[in-house]
Amino acid sequence: MSQLKTIFKWYEAWFNSEDFNGCMFQKALEEVIKIYPSTLEPATKYKIWLTTLIQGLLTNIGIRNPSHLATLIVSILDGMTIQAHINRHSVDMDEYWMRVEHLIAFEKALP
């Protein structure tokens, strides 16, 4: 669980850094893909890498079917990134993390 929380702490530090301007992969998919379709591949590879990393961490803490929860957590991270880009001080990481812990506890309780 601590490794997964470290990812969230990394995002928090990134959001609060002076040079934070949102996610280049999100920007590539939203803004640049029509002009430069080649931006799709690195953005997709990054998303697959992050999802796979989180799936492995969830497996390590006893989640039997981690793929859906990993995808949901990546979506939460994406949403936080967009929110931080709009207003970097609006992301309360402790609140997000508490909800992720609830999701993990829910998944662990499934039969």
Predicted stretch roles:
Residues E12, T51, Q55, E101-I104:
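Structural signal for well-ordered, non-membrane alpha-helices
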Residues L40-Y46, T59-E107, P111:
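Hydrophobic/aromatic-rich alpha-helical bundle segments in the mid-to-C-terminal region
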Residues F8-K9, P37-L40:
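Short alpha-helical transmembrane interface motifs in multi-pass membrane proteins
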Residues S17-Y36:
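Amphipathic alpha-helical segments used for helix-helix packing
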Residues F8-Y11, F25-L29, I73, L77-M80:
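Short alpha-helical scaffolding segments that buttress acidic/His motifs in well-ordered protein cores
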Residues T6, P42-T52:
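A non-catalytic, amphipathic alpha-helix used as a structural packing/dimerization or gating element
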Residues M1-S17, N60, A70-I73:
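Hydrophobic alpha-helical connector segments
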